Amino acid sequence: MPMSRPDSAVSLLPDYSLRAHNTFGFDARARVAARIGSPGQFASLARDPRVAGLDRLVLGGGSNVVFTRDFDGLVLLDEIRGRALVREDDGAWYVEAGGGENWHAFVEWTLAEGMPGLENLALIPGTVGAAPIQNIGAYGLEMKEHFASLRAVELATGELVEFDAARCAFGYRDSFFKRDGRGRFAIVAVTFRLPKAWTPRIGYADVARELAARGIDARAVRARDVFDAVVAIRRAKLPDPLALGNAGSFFKNPVIDAQAFAALRAREPDIVSYPQPDGRVKLAAGWLIDRCGWKGRALGAAAVHERQALVLVNLGGASGADVLALAHAIRRDVLGRFGVELEMEPVCL
């Protein structure tokens, strides 16, 4: 796969502003930063005496991070680009993309190349390298369903390591890289398996409604139709980070056991829920937050978005600490009313 630039000496950027590298727009600063354009540059910094002993943070699109303070260490800005069909067989295409590739642009490219499968994940902010960390998902599809493998550099040693799905240990918005592997690796390339026998995922009510509104027969739907529908839905519901700082969905949809759900539904008969294959039930965190009266409310310059209660926004001038205080207040109220603990999606630093 082509990379954005060849291995070369890495220039260090002292006292570097991260405002343009996080979608909340917080003006945190890094003690030092480096732009990384190849796996070899990640590896070289493992042995570089200029940054010996510094904590390290890999940043892609910055759409899943809340800076509550400056970062007193080395921030590695992943700019590894490139995307290509690396092989195919009778059943599938295998496509690889660099960790610094924009996720949405990559999804659009796969469709333009006639390789559908990722269209339900359109317009999710961030980079390809961040997608496995979070096991991103939307509208009935999780990234892990099309994941083949990834390559990552171990930051402490510079070793290039290959991960299959089992080693990644994917869960709901979760993976090895958020647990035991947190902060240890930089994902430099991800390979996806896209089956040639394409089946549309249009079971979500929002997607079905959008397709119907466009006059598209579900029996004749194309991957591009699903892509366009998802993009339209997300643009209608979610604020553009360039206009209003945010990190997308701030809370995970909680999953509870069937007994707890039965008790909850007895008190809240109109609760929004989604049965899971293992017998548990996923709840809509946005509905819980809305019922607690938080939708559209603000604490200072941090607020809950008026159209989507899952999204916390920076109205202008908010700090990471302000957003975190708002998140804690929401979690407290949801726990008090429903007995359900919300888990935050972004990493708070």
Curated annotation (Swiss-Prot):
Its EC number is 1.3.1.98. Residues 26-197 form the FAD-binding PCMH-type domain. It is found in: Cytoplasm. Pfam families: FAD_binding_4 (PF01565), MurB_C (PF02873). Disulfide bonds: none annotated. GO terms for cellular component: cytosol. This is UDP-N-acetylenolpyruvoylglucosamine reductase. It comes from Burkholderia pseudomallei (strain 1710b).
